[in-house]
A protein has these predicted regions:
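C-terminal His-loop and adjacent cap/lid subdomain of alpha/beta-hydrolase
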Residues: 2-195
Length: 195
């Protein structure tokens, strides 16, 4: 079997209000979804935990989808033929903030989001693809939709989850079970504390 990747563009528009970045020229923003069809038995996927326990299509492939955004020169021939991939921690797009000294935005589109144009003046394509399956929608976060791994009887795979709490201030006496409103917390399998 062969893995398949399909990028479905749902939005295409000028980036940075059509501003030209030196010899590279203007940029455009492509937004959409990437559809992955993965062979769970392939050597490259061997270390993906429980991938072999996800539902498969008739050809034996496992499917998932991720948000994707690309900033690229309108004329690719004027670019440097290099791609900068920002994995986007917790669904956020940070590369322009850190490399272009731009204001942070999960919806980069304006001249302010281009900042000093560091990537653009050098001709890079900048790409974000969601990679965390526990993010909730909101604030333009990148989302990844993954299948649920299941036991042979069809029930979801469950197990012990351990959490480490770090005290970061003197006098702290309690912690929320999930400190991130952007992350999906899975419900407890059982509320029986004797287990």
């Amino acid at each position: 079997m062969t893995n398949r990747i399909e990028f479905i563009i749902t939005d295409r528009r000028p980036f940075a209000d059509g501003q030209s970045f030196g010899e590279v020229g203007p940029y455009e923003r492509l937004s959409g979804r990437v559809h992955f069809a993965l062979d769970p038995l392939a050597a490259a996927q061997r270390d993906v935990v429980d991938l072999d326990k996800a539902a498969r299509d008739p050809g034996g492939l496992v499917h998932c989808e991720a948000d994707c955004m690309i900033l690229k020169p309108v004329d690719l021939a004027r670019g440097n033929r290099r791609l900068f991939y920002d994995y986007g921690n917790r669904g956020h797009k940070r590369a322009l903030q850190f490399f272009n000294d731009a204001q942070h935005s999960n919806d980069p589109l304006t001249t302010a989001h281009a900042g000093n144009g560091f990537f653009m003046r050098r001709g890079y394509c900048v790409v974000w693809v969601a990679w965390e399956g526990d993010m909730l929608p909101g604030d333009g976060r990148m989302l990844l939709d993954v299948p649920v791994a299941r036991n042979d009887d069809g029930s979801p795979i469950t197990g012990t989850v351990r959490v480490e709490y770090m005290v970061d201030a003197p006098g702290r006496t309690s912690f929320p079970l999930s400190g991130r409103t952007a992350a999906h917390s899975f419900p407890a399998v059982s509320l029986d504390t004797r287990q």
